[in-house]
């Protein structure tokens, strides 16, 4: 019987990045060329791990495998929620992998659950810990269609109370770092053996007896190998990775042994480029050579029940040498890179959030008891609404959790109370403390969640809690002199992000001027309908006045908003917005302002605007981030076209100088070089974006760029070229007989070769292999020799080699 077992666990997680008021991730410039970091990491890691390439002869792709089906993994619930909306194909591949793994691992699934929003459990109160576990379990059941056997703890942070809560809710096991074991003993023996600095023996399962009489199984991963995977170069070779795992099995092995590691899942592709391929080849090499049995924790436990007991080291984690201090003190653990920076801000940040949570808890209880006997049980059940905000599902939630039929305003209040509690847990997401500076993107994110809590608290309870909250944050020093402290960070990054029905109405009012508005639309998690929208234009000036109905799809809050957009300085527009006035007042204001605008009296328009709507502001400031970027791009588009026209004249006029530059070895003036590079970049992007690419022009420009060493925007051009090739390959997959499309793909690949673009074409390669399978299994009629010749050439340029495509050629 095989006694050598290997399990690789990936903890796939990103902190929630959604704007708390909009429930969507806004544009993040640092993730360029992607929209945001979720999108970028999904492209680099989550997606390719579902179709990871295994290389054959000539270092060409021979097949692709779903890594998730052969490893143990967990995904953060908030990340899966984002993927379900924005990367549905990749999301479905993850769910499918869990089902596939059940056939492979004795009906045990590869996926395990995670505490809901990555809260450091030992630092949470028991009530939040319980909700985190309940929400994590229910989210898992909703997505994977089964109960989870195990659960991942954020940062593997643990104490006995946390384990008790896991066991209470049916969780069978969790995974910890080796230094988190305190002492062990063989089942049936009385004497405990302390675990020394070297750590616990990681090659077996342990059972942890709990004070309540319950128990939970614990796996302690191999620390040295995990560190080499995460922080060294072990992923440069799948064979080396496999050999490193195999190398720690005892030579004289008579009993089953489990070699297993746990790392951030993002290690496989995001932190280490093409790390997914090292993982897939490692697993393939081990299985195909019968070097060990690849398994997962649930299967291993069933086959080999624990023979030893363990007690944990209390309040420890995998990423802090000081226990869990990284998330509440200046313990010295940090990312580094900023010499002299401290983390003295961590303690006051946690103190501020703890104060906010504990201060608002009695208010929540008092107000929720008007609708339900157990306010905290209602919060536990709220995950059903978070998972499905369909109106009927929310109505069912009210019926199941509230005492009586609720009025419309009562439903709004219940939802607001529960949203306050949801954000009061989101604000404890661990990443807010993990990094070096409170004003970093992660610190700002949890402060924004706190900002949403404060806004809801003021609206619900009529009290201002913000002042004292900021007072505590004043004791959280920033490392950046201009930001001073946490209170200043809050004022700079949180307060401007806050919005409400009026803010959403202002966004719509301005954005509608740049759209073909159709009477209303969705604005993130709000529904907007036009009640009045009157646009007037005269002598190049624009005036809009209107009324909008705005409704939150989250809290069901609704109301009307009045707005006006008027000419500002220069070509700018100014806008003002307010809660709706009476019908009669609005009608009078509408008529008065329209009359004055028609007369051309700009000063009077400004006076009336301030009188009836309040102070105006530059219209684009009312827009949310993505719409600001879109409209700004539209506004400057005409200017860019004008630049292009002038630059193109220069480019064409001085083109002969390029030949002289080469023959005489003379450098072009920098200004002329800039003009030429601008045109070459524009032409490359335009050619690659067109449905029918002019291959001749593409070849000519690529040759010019290489010949004369012009600089191109390789990141952007690579991204556009990659998207174009993937699109064409997917189209070809739907209609493999389309020779012209196949030729077009091959032509683009050959034409862009001189540019040395960074093309990660795994999606195109997957389509190629799918077409090859159609030929191999006979679902595609035997192709003509010309098709096979071109298909083989395309495979060469895509660096794909498959038995299916070879077999297809031999069968003709």
What are these regions (language model features)?
Residues 92-110, 134, 146, 167-210, ...:
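Acidic, His- and aromatic-enriched active-site or binding-groove loops in soluble protein domains
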Residues 5-10, 14-127, 131-132, 147-153, ...:
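Short, well-structured secondary-structure segments
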Residues 73, 152-156, 176-178, 219-221, ...:
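Short His-Asn-centered micro-motif
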Residues 2-56, 78, 192-514, 539, ...:
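Active-site and substrate-binding clefts of carbohydrate-active enzymes
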Residues 129-153, 246-260:
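CE4/NodB-like, metal-dependent polysaccharide N-deacetylase domain
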Residues 118, 148-158, 264-268, 439-444:
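Conserved short loop/turn motifs at secondary-structure junctions
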Residues 124, 182-191, 228, 306:
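Short, charged, surface-exposed secondary-structure boundary motifs
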Residues 651-812:
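Extended alpha-helical scaffold segments
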């Amino acid at each position: 019987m095989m006694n050598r077992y290997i399990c690789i666990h990936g903890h796939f997680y990103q902190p929630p990045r959604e704007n708390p008021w909009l429930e969507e991730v806004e544009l993040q410039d640092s993730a360029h060329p992607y929209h945001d970091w979720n999108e970028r990491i999904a492209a680099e890691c989550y997606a390719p791990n579902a179709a990871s390439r295994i290389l054959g002869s000539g270092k060409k792709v021979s097949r692709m495998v779903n890594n998730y089906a052969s490893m143990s993994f967990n995904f953060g619930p908030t990340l899966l929620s984002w993927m379900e909306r924005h990367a549905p194909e990749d999301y479905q591949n993850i769910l499918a992998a869990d089902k596939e793994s059940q056939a492979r691992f004795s009906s045990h699934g590869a996926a395990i659950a995670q505490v809901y929003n990555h809260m450091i459990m030992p630092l949470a109160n028991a009530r939040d810990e319980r909700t985190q576990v309940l929400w994590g379990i229910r989210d898992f059941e909703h997505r994977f269609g089964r109960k989870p056997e195990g659960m991942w703890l954020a940062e593997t942070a643990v104490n006995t109370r946390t384990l008790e809560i896991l066991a209470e809710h049916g969780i069978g096991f969790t995974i910890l770092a080796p230094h988190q074991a305190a002492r062990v003993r063989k089942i049936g023996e009385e004497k405990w053996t302390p675990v020394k600095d070297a750590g616990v023996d990681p090659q077996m399962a342990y059972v942890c007896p709990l004070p309540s009489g319950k128990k939970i199984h614990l796996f302690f991963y191999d620390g040295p190998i995990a560190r080499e995977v995460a922080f060294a170069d072990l992923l440069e070779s799948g064979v080396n990775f496999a050999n490193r795992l195999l190398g720690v099995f005892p030579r004289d092995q008579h009993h089953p042994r489990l070699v297993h590691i746990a790392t951030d899942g993002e290690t496989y592709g995001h932190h280490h480029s093409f790390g997914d391929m090292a993982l897939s080849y490692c697993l393939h090499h081990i299985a195909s050579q019968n070097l060990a049995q690849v398994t997962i924790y649930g299967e291993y436990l069933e086959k080999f029940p624990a023979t030893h007991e363990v007690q944990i080291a209390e309040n420890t984690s995998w990423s802090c040498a000081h226990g869990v201090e990284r998330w509440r003190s200046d313990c010295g653990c940090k990312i580094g890179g900023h010499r002299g920076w401290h983390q003295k801000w961590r303690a006051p940040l946690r103190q501020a959030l703890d104060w906010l949570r504990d201060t608002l808890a009695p208010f929540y209880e008092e107000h929720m008891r008007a609708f339900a006997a157990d306010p905290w049980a209602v919060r536990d059940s709220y995950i059903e609404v978070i998972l499905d905000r369909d109106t009927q599902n929310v109505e069912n939630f009210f019926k199941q959790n509230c005492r009586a039929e609720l009025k419309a305003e009562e439903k709004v209040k219940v939802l607001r109370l529960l949203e306050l509690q949801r954000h009061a847990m989101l604000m404890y997401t661990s990443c807010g403390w993990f990094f070096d500076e409170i004003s970093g993107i992660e610190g700002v994110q949890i402060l924004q969640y706190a900002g949403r809590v404060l806004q809801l608290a003021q609206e619900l309870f009529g009290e201002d809690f913000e002042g004292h909250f900021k007072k505590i944050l004043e004791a959280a020093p920033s490392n950046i002199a201009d930001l001073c402290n946490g209170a200043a960070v809050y004022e700079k990054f949180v307060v401007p992000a806050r919005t409400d029905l009026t803010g959403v109405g202002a966004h719509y009012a301005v954005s509608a001027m740049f759209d073909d508005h159709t009477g209303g639309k969705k604005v993130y998690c709000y529904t907007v309908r036009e009640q009045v929208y009157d646009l007037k234009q005269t002598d190049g000036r624009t005036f809009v006045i209107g009324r909008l109905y705005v409704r939150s799809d989250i809290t069901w809050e609704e109301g009307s908003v009045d707005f006006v957009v008027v000419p500002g300085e220069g070509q700018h527009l100014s806008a003002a917005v307010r809660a709706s006035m009476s019908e009669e007042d609005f009608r009078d204001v509408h008529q008065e302002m329209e009359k004055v605008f028609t007369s051309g009296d700009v000063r009077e328009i400004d006076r009336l605007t301030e009188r009836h709507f309040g102070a105006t502001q530059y219209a684009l400031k009312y827009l949310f981030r993505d719409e600001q970027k879109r409209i700004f791009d539209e506004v400057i588009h005409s200017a860019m076209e004008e630049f292009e026209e002038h630059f193109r004249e220069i480019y064409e006029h001085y083109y002969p100088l390029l030949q002289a530059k080469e023959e005489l070895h003379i450098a072009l003036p920098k200004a002329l070089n800039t003009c030429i590079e601008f045109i070459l970049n524009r032409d490359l992007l335009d050619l690659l974006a067109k449905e029918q690419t002019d291959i001749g022009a593409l070849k000519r420009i690529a040759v010019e760029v290489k010949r004369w060493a012009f600089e191109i925007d390789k990141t952007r051009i690579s991204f556009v070229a990659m998207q174009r090739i993937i699109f064409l390959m997917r189209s070809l997959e739907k209609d493999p007989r389309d020779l012209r499309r196949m030729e077009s793909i091959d032509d683009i690949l050959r034409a862009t070769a001189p540019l040395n673009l960074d093309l990660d074409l795994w999606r195109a390669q997957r389509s190629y292999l799918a077409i090859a399978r159609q030929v191999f299994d006979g679902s595609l009629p035997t192709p003509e020799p010309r098709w096979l010749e071109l298909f083989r050439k395309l495979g060469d340029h895509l660096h794909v080699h498959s038995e299916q495509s070879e077999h297809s050629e031999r069968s003709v």
